[in-house]
Amino acid sequence: MTLQIGVIGCGAIGQDHIRRLTRTLSGARVVAVNDIDPQQARDAVTKYGLDAEIYGDGHDVVAAADVQALLVTSWGPTHEAFVLDAIAHGKPVFCEKPLAVTADGCMRIVEAEVAHGKRLVQVGFMRPYDEGYRALKRVIDSGEIGAPLMLHCAHRNQSVGERYTTDMAITDTLIHELDVLRWLLGEDYASAQVVYPKKTRHASAHLADPQIVLLETVSGVRIDVEIFVNCQYGYDIQCEVVGENGIAKLPDPPAVGLKHAARQSVEIMTDWKERFIASYDVELQAFIDGVRAGALTGPSAWDGYAAAVAADACVRAQRSAAVEPIAMAERPAFYRG
């Protein structure tokens, strides 16, 4: 069976997913598209040679009889309504982050999915599909380094645009760590604090950069995450887990070591899409395979909710300079195990 997918949102990430659906992945084809800018939708159909219907309203894509599953890559504030509509139609939906722009919105999706009685939602957190993170989790789960005590992490971008704001360091950048570190450790967060080092001269006047986020999990693991989005030298993701008996570190992407002109160097990537390109392929293939098998296994609506609750606390901590509690609702039995 070839899964027939409708895509809502044909901007950069939407077209990137359309590209992989048509040229890289197997078992699916795009049969319907929509974008708030009709020309974007037409361009996607032409660029990728799609035999797909163009709809003026994303909700019409959800309702289309030939659409079996949805891919939501539209503007963030529209995600909640489209995902809820997909659940109401009983159609599986892959939703890029954020699942919703508020934790309350995420909870509405959780409640709708639980009421439906079957998992239909996968959230576009791709780092759990990265082979480096998977290898790191295997080491942690093996017990080789003992119980994790501390994590030292960094999320560095070469630069960001003028429209990037201080809170986006949480909602657009740290959100990936909030998801993947919770997955690595297998436990939720208890509190968050944000501190501000000396500001880089490369940051816009309205942007606090860098920032350090201090997290504590429910078992007492301490996590520090450096967010530095104007680091200049490249795109660099670091994660070191300090355990009772040893240390495990996220491997850097493979690169050729160069010795030349009395120098030794290794190239550092500058594009976040290049760093995790394989992970995007694997996560979307997992969605296709899960829908066809009748059982989704990727990041759930509950994971989207958990990330949103933690992000809200971090944004509060940015403003209060205090340690902010992270209080989640009780996890429904639907999402356990």
Swiss-Prot record:
This is Inositol 2-dehydrogenase. The keyword Ribosomal protein does not apply. It comes from the Bacteria. The lineage of its organism: Bacteria, Pseudomonadati, Pseudomonadota, Betaproteobacteria, Burkholderiales. Homotetramer. Gene3D superfamilies: Dihydrodipicolinate Reductase, domain 2, NAD(P)-binding Rossmann-like Domain. The gene is iolG. GO terms for molecular function: inositol 2-dehydrogenase (NAD+) activity; nucleotide binding. It comes from Burkholderia vietnamiensis (strain G4 / LMG 22486). Belongs to the Gfo/Idh/MocA family. The keyword Ligase does not apply. Involved in the oxidation of myo-inositol (MI) to 2-keto-myo-inositol (2KMI or 2-inosose). PANTHER family: INOSITOL 2-DEHYDROGENASE, PTHR43593. Keywords: NAD, Oxidoreductase. Its EC number is 1.1.1.18.
